[in-house]
UniProtKB/Swiss-Prot annotation:
InterPro entries: GLA-like_dom_SF, GLA_domain, Osteocalcin. Ca(2+) 1 binds at E68. Disulfide bonds join C67-C73. Ca(2+) 3 binds at E61. This is Osteocalcin 1. Keywords: Biomineralization, Calcium, Disulfide bond, Gamma-carboxyglutamic acid, Hormone, Metal-binding, Secreted, Signal. Residues 22-50 form a propeptide. The carboxylated form is one of the main organic components of the bone matrix, which constitutes 1-2% of the total bone protein. The carboxylated form binds strongly to apatite and calcium.
Length: 95
């Protein structure tokens, strides 16, 4: 019975020492910026970014007019759609 109580006390001592070591290894943080309340502007804008809206008919028509000037873009427009063709040949849609 004595050995059991000694083993329990030793295990509690080891447990207390290791838990104190894990708390003391982390520095005390006093400023809210280091606690994660603030994020970088790029991260915040990617989280808050709105979903893209659907294009109106006049916007699609202006994309079609630009794409009709390039024969390869016009062929792709007929098979893949105006948005895919425009973004492939001219980059992101400006509006």
């Amino acid at each position: 019975m004595k050995t059991l109580s000694v083993l329990v006390l030793c295990s509690l001592a080891v447990l207390c020492l290791t838990s104190d070591a894990s708390f003391s290894s982390q520095p005390a943080v006093d400023t809210p910026a280091q606690e994660g309340l603030f994020v970088e502007q790029e991260q915040a804008s990617s989280v808050v970014r709105q979903a893209p809206k659907e294009l109106s008919l006049s916007q699609l028509e202006s994309l079609r007019e630009v794409c009709e000037l390039n024969l390869a873009c016009e062929d792709m427009m007929d098979t893949s759609g105006i948005i895919a063709a425009y973004t492939t040949y001219y980059g992101p849609i400006p509006f």
